Each structure stands twice: as structure tokens, then as C-alpha cells.
């Protein structure tokens, strides 16, 4: 059986206090930049922007972030303002678990004052998030059995 592995790192916005976690991506700031500004900026940077109707988000493919190559980077909006930036990787092998562990350790080191909280912790699905009061950084993966 083929395995589908998804690793996803998402940055999302919750309005509260001062942000410590990175909140700017591709020249766009969470909670500030409008949808039009994000799309215009991505076009200027030479990205081909696609829209996913099912998930109601825009995305670009084949990007590098945090020293890793990602299949996609998605952008979600709330009230026409950038609210989430997510990085995803699809793979048919479990090397993604190593990438997840590496990214999790990097975030724990970089944001040591923010406690990570596991919301899912089993062999096929892990999700940990860090919340500084404004920005939520979540790191996770999901392994699905395929045909």
C-alpha cells in the first residue's frame, strides 16, 4: 500500500498581545496585509498563484522556507486580511517524520519561552502548536494509507 504523508507548518493569526513569532512572509504581514496586496506581491515576485475552491485558499508551489523545500505555500484570509500562511509537503515515505522532528526542535530552540502544546500525538498524525498571543505557529504531519 502506498502511504501519503503530509507535513504542514502553518502560521495563523489570533488578535491578542505582542507577537514574538515571525509574522511576515514574502513581504506580507499577518493581520495587516490585504488579499489584493498579497496576490499582487506574489505576482511581482514571479509566483504563479492558484486558488483551491474546496479549501478556500490561495497557494503557490515549490517554495523554500526555513531552509527546506516545500510542495506548496498556502494563504488564507479573514475579512480580506492575511490570517494564515501554511507550508506543506507531500511524500510517499516517512522521511517527513524526520523533517517534522527537525522543524519542531528548531522552533522549540528559537521560541524557547513559548510552550508547545500537542493537539494530536500518535504514529500517523502529530500536531504541535506555539501561541504567543497573536501568532500561532503549528507544526504537524499526517500519514494516510492510500491505494
PLM features per residue range, with description:
Residues 16, 80-84:
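Short amphipathic alpha-helical segments, especially helix-boundary/capping motifs
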Residues 42-79:
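N-terminal, post-signal-peptide region of Sec/Tat-exported proteins
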